[in-house]
Amino acid sequence: CGPCFTKDPETEKKCATCCGGIGRCFGPQCLCNRGY
């Protein structure tokens, strides 16, 4: 899923939403439950 921006307070939420509810930011990458 799309990149995570550390300066965006919503980025973790956007990542999770993009991943269909399961997603985490690891550095600049948004990783879904499958790893990308």
UniProtKB/Swiss-Prot annotation:
Gene Ontology MF term list: chloride channel regulator activity; toxin activity
Q: Which organism is it from?
A: Hottentotta tamulus sindicus (Scorpion)
Name assigned to this protein: Chlorotoxin-like peptide Bs 14
Q: What does this protein do?
A: Toxin with unknown function in healthy organisms. On glioma cells, interacts with chloride channels (probably ClC-3/CLCN3) and MMP2 at the surface of glioma cells. This complex is then internalized via caveolae, thus inhibiting the chloride channels necessary for cell shrinkage and tumor propagation.
| InterPro entries (UniProt xref) | Scorpion_toxin-like_sf, Scorpion_toxinS_Cl_inh
The free-text domain note is: The presence of a 'disulfide through disulfide knot' structurally defines this protein as a knottin.
S-S bonds: C1-C18, C4-C25, C15-C30, C19-C32
State the PROSITE patterns in the record: SHORT_SCORPION_CHLORIDE
A GO cellular-component term linked to this record: extracellular region
Q: Which UniProt keywords apply?
A: Chloride channel impairing toxin, Disulfide bond, Ion channel impairing toxin, Knottin, Secreted, Toxin, Voltage-gated chloride channel impairing toxin
Expressed, tissue-wise, as follows: Expressed by the venom gland.
Quote the Pfam families the UniProt record gives: Toxin_5
Similarity section:
Belongs to the short scorpion toxin superfamily. Chloride channel inhibitor family.
Q: Where in the cell is it found?
A: Secreted
